[in-house]
A protein has these predicted regions:
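Inter-Walker segment of RecA-like/P-loop motor cores
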Residues: 150-188
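Walker A/P-loop
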Residues: 92-118
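Catalytic cores of nucleotide-enabled group-transfer and carboxylate-activating enzymes in metabolic
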Residues: 59, 106, 112, 144-153, ...
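Conserved Walker A/P-loop ATP-binding site and its immediately adjacent core
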Residues: 124-147, 161
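Post-Walker A helix-loop "phosphate-sensing" segment adjacent to the P-loop in P-loop NTPases
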Residues: 117-126, 148-152
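Pre-Walker A (Motif I) flank of P-loop NTPase domains
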Residues: 92-99, 124-126, 182-184
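N-terminal accessory nucleic-acid engagement/regulatory domains that precede
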Residues: 1-69
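Conserved pre-motif I regulatory segment
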Residues: 63-100
């Protein structure tokens, strides 16, 4: 009985290993094909130096746009202070942190500043924005896209993410990115 159970367990694990290897081969084939045919570049294809430059460039872009915002009222000054503290907090090691501030306090841009600076300082290959409610994802996505200024760097992956007006190559590239979450900034 023990020998039979061990044999079944061994077959199960061998089956799982075979599935893993087949998945890796298929994923590798898709990447090579996409890279060759469509000139798709994945985040892990970027060198650490290229990623650092990307994050620093985006961080500078966001800082520049934020610098253009007025900060005359007390609310505007408070938003700026929260944002600056989040940016400074990026030097801390990675972890799970909470940002508890009231509605309208600038959480999206404050967390974006933190994420970009943290990614640059700590060699991260991607940034994930995760929210439990689609309305929040949609709202944050619009703000992030506006400040990043390059939709090709952002992947939205949720049930409301519908792409219109894209060519077949762009749709194929997006599908590949969705399957692997290989975009520098992922919103889900």
């Amino acid at each position: 009985d023990t020998a039979r159970r061990q044999s079944e367990e061994a077959r199960f694990y061998l089956g799982m290993l075979a599935r893993l290897l087949i998945s890796a081969v298929i994923e590798g084939d898709r990447r090579v094909t996409a890279g060759f045919e469509q000139d798709v570049r994945f985040p892990q294809d970027r060198t650490p130096e290229e990623l650092r430059i990307l994050w620093e460039t985006l961080s500078d872009r966001v800082d520049r746009k934020l610098g253009e915002l007025p900060h005359r009222t007390e609310v505007e000054k408070a938003r700026r202070e929260i944002s600056d503290r989040c940016r400074a907090f990026a030097e801390k090691p990675g972890g799970v942190y909470r940002l508890n501030v009231p509605t309208g306090a600038g959480k999206t841009l404050s967390s974006l500043r933190y994420a970009l600076a943290h990614a640059a300082l700590h060699g991260k290959s991607r940034i994930l924005f995760v929210a439990p409610i689609l309305a929040i994802i949609d709202q944050n996505s619009k703000v992030i896209r506006q400040y990043i200024g390059d939709d090709s760097l952002i992947l939205e992956h949720h049930s409301n993410a519908v792409q219109t007006g894209l060519s077949q190559n762009e749709l194929d590239e997006r599908e590949l990115l969705v399957q692997s979450w290989d975009a520098p900034i992922i919103i889900t």
